Design a protein with these regions (language model features):
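Accessory N-terminal region flanking or inserted into the helicase ATPase core
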Residues: 1-28, 33, 37-40, 56-58, ...
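Short amphipathic alpha-helical segments
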Residues: 71-73, 101, 117, 128, ...
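Conserved phosphoryl-transfer catalytic core
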Residues: 77-78, 124, 237-250
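Short gly/pro/ser/thr-enriched loop/turn and capping motifs at secondary-structure boundaries
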Residues: 96, 249-252
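Acidic/polar active-site rim loop that often engages polyanionic ligands
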Residues: 100-112, 126, 154
Length: 252
């Protein structure tokens, strides 16, 4: 790999960002400022200069297209890189899925490695089935998906209950969790939540299943609460953060 050629392409500001090794580095990059170039250069710098294995990096993007572009640029610069080495390069849900399938002990949660992903419509249909079977009293069924997401958020925060909930929503949420486990299925939300849960259980241990050294994030300004929590899970294990974003394009 010709690292010097990649280095020569960077301007002084980009070089400063690429070589920054602080616990967390946030790079403000507007449209057309060479964001993908900086991300790729950071990955190459860590691998070639700091000798960090590609496997020990997590690269998080919001689309498969963005992840593919980073991989393609990486391969052009380093033809020796293999798909296996970049299996942790992808969307938030995709990376969480890969970690659960290949590196994290999902068996401790009651799942097997061949668990499937439950689509949102399937979860909603299951919820309605449980309501009918268990004769649950649920208000605002037309907003059930949103209410279940809120119940999950409140539960994760450790609160006593869903504010203003005067029905069986919490019972339904518990039954849904049990049924998903019985079917060996996780929702997209479960992927990040369970990956974080398993990494937290290993916090402080000398040998960890994930053992990620760097988290590199594209379009960080678009992260919602769950995605930020996912990033925090890696940092709690000792990983450093390098994030690139455009503050003028904030969605959340």
């Amino acid at each position: 790999m010709d690292w010097e050629r990649e280095w020569e392409r960077l301007n002084p500001y980009q070089r400063e960002a690429v070589t920054d090794e602080n616990k967390a580095c946030l790079v403000s990059a507007n449209v057309g400022s060479g964001k993908t170039t900086v991300l790729t250069a950071k990955i190459l710098y860590l691998h070639e200069v700091k000798h960090v294995s590609y496997r020990d990096m997590v690269v998080l993007t919001f689309t498969n297209k963005a992840a593919s572009e980073i991989r393609e640029r990486l391969v052009r610069a380093d033809p020796s890189v293999t798909p296996e080495e970049t299996e942790n390069f992808g969307t938030f849900h995709g990376v969480a899925l890969g970690l659960l399938k290949k590196r994290l002990p999902v068996e401790t949660l009651g799942y097997t490695k061949d668990f499937m992903v439950m689509e949102p419509d399937e979860e909603l249909e299951l919820a309605h089935t449980l309501i009918a079977e268990k004769k649950l009293k649920i208000k605002y069924k037309n907003r059930l998906r949103k209410r279940l997401a809120e119940a999950e958020r409140v539960s994760a925060a450790g609160d006593a209950g869903v504010a203003g909930s005067q029905d069986d929503l919490e019972i339904l949420a518990g039954l849904l969790t049990e049924e998903k486990l019985r079917r060996n299925k996780m929702t997209f939300s479960d992927l990040m939540k369970n990956a974080c849960l398993l990494m937290a259980k290993e916090e402080g241990e000398e040998e960890r299943s994930a053992d990620i050294q760097w988290v590199i994030v594209d379009e960080v300004q678009d992260c919602d609460g769950k995605q930020l929590e996912f990033i925090d899970c890696f940092m709690a294990e000792g990983a450093k953060l390098f994030a690139v974003g455009d503050p003028n394009q904030v969605i959340y």
